[in-house]
Amino acid sequence: MTPSVMDRAVLTMAAFGTGMLGAASFVWCFLFRSLFASCVLERAVDELFFWGSLCVQVMMLFFCFRKYSKTLSRYLDLICAVNIVALFGCLICLQYKMGFRTYLPILFSLNLIWLSVWLPVTFEAVYLCPPYANAYFQLGFFTATTVHYLLLSFGSVTTSFLFIPFACFLIAGLYSLRVLKKQEEFKSAILDRRAIFITRDNLYVTINFSVIPSFIGMELCVVAVMTVGFAVFMTAAGVYTDVVKVLKTYLLMFQFGTFCVGGMGYPSRKATFVYCMTACILMPLVFVLQDLTIKSVLFLAIFFLFINGVTCETTIMLAKLKKGINGPKIVLSVCLLVNICITLSLNVLYKVYIETLKK
């Protein structure tokens, strides 16, 4: 049955709202770093922000290897309520200027653990739907992060108003997730993945992780080569140029790059080649040019090309794994591994730069 225009519109809006929910853990890190940097010792905040965000992505990887859908679905409302309560707890610490070195880091860390649930849950739901919904998920993800970035850029960094959009995105995102799971296109996607021989523990076709290389081995190799290549370039740029001075600005983007590419990730190896070759042509300019602003723009452009190349490959992976109910989880695990590798390289590079300045 072909979905009507109204059905597609509802799925589009639901995917957009679900994308805002998926960005919750990254926005939480961004808010904490921006709002409380002046309240807590700078070193302590940096350590918590840098390494805490990496740990939460490792936790998301754990979710990719677990059957959690049925269990978590019963407690999503409770998890959202816990997130809101923790948010108000941090708001009280900010308002009354207390617990900056005790309660605040604890609240931040505990809430970050609970927020880590949302990206795996939303990613799996949306990426089981038709491809057009994926682009709107990415748009919602980008909107949630951009709204908070703009509020911080054009307003006071100490205002508690910044927590209001975050709470709204949580509530609206959870509602959107509920709506999305009621759509016929989502239900059809679930039915298409039902196993031929159904047992109690095997309702759907599941791709075993041991056979993944036979399905997407080439794509995994291409992604690995691109990731290593970009990490080497980033390290060289940090060592031999002064672009490292502004690398901290890119940190948030590096953490969610593979989840937000503006819909430019096409399922084509030719597109991957074009992105990679363009990036390779631009890389030497970062070492040759003198103007820091131009080099920073080029660095961001190369990162954008790298991420789109990776997304082309993950889109191909998703197409090859479309028969498995856990196909989106496998793709999510690849995206997380890329993010973790790049963010870890950036963090280490920036820490070395900070230590060098202290000497």
UniProtKB/Swiss-Prot annotation:
Q: Any stretches that span the bilayer, and where are they?
A: 12-32, 45-65, 75-95, 103-123, 132-152, 154-174, 220-240, 246-266, 271-289, 296-318, 330-350
Give compartment(s): Host membrane
User: Which UniProt key words apply to this protein?
Assistant: Host membrane, Membrane, Transmembrane, Transmembrane helix
Q: How does it sit in the membrane?
A: Multi-pass membrane protein
Spell out the Pfam families in the cross-references.
Herpes_BMRF2
| Disulfide linkage | none
Q: Record's Gene Ontology CC terms?
A: host cell membrane; membrane
- Which family does the record claim for this protein? Belongs to the herpesviridae BMRF2 family.
From the Swiss-Prot or TrEMBL record, give the protein name. Gene 58 protein
List the source organism: Equine herpesvirus 2 (strain 86/87)
- Chain's gene name: 58
